[in-house]
């Protein structure tokens, strides 16, 4: 895990980095709530910039049914996302959350109100975990504002995951706000109050 909560991180050059395995927090970003300790959640208010010819693979591998719903890149479970993630240059990024969090964005039960910018010639694949968007918010989160921008010659593959609501199925968006829980675990879409721009 590369821990970034309120600081600034730049990954540049022409090397590659693989981050895998289970962690309570994001593989790159802020810490997440731990079901073992009952604490640990942390907001992401800083910035992450992935650029040049860097290749990044960030995968949160499934641990157990009480696993935390952190993003692969962004905020951990119960952590709000008000920072900025920029991926540009010729960077190649694969972000896979696997469980209740987005590939890139705000973890489970947090709030998305930051900025994700993908541009240049970047190539990005972002896969959401259970009931989560590929890019955006995790399960049972809010999306109160902020932006997601995809521009220039960048190529983005975003994959939302099916929900696990009782007796129903709920498909979540590739980009945007994820499924919102209710007392009966029937699917309900969270309000999407931010802006998505693809040019």
Regions found by a protein language model. Give the residues of each.
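Surface-exposed loop/turn motifs in large extracellular/passenger domains
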Residues: 1-21, 30-100, 104-128, 135-199
């Amino acid at each position: 895990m590369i821990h970034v909560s309120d600081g600034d991180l730049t990954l540049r050059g022409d090397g590659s980095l693989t981050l895998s395995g289970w962690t309570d927090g994001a593989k790159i970003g802020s810490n997440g709530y731990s079901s073992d300790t009952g604490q640990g959640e942390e907001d992401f208010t800083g910035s992450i910039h992935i650029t040049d010819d860097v290749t990044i693979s960030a995968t949160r591998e499934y641990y157990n049914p009480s696993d935390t719903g952190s993003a692969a890149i962004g905020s951990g479970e119960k952590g709000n996302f008000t920072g900025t993630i920029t991926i540009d240059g010729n960077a190649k990024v694969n972000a896979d959350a696997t469980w209740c969090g987005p590939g890139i964005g705000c973890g489970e039960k947090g709030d998305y109100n930051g900025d994700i910018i993908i541009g240049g010639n970047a190539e990005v694949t972002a896969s959401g975990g259970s009931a989560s968007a590929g890019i955006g918010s995790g399960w049972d989160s809010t999306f109160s504002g902020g932006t997601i921008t995809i521009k220039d010659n960048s190529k983005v593959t975003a994959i939302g995951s099916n929900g696990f609501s009782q007796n129903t199925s709920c498909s979540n968006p590739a980009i945007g706000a994820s499924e919102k829980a209710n007392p009966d675990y029937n699917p309900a879409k969270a309000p999407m109050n931010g802006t998505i721009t693809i040019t």
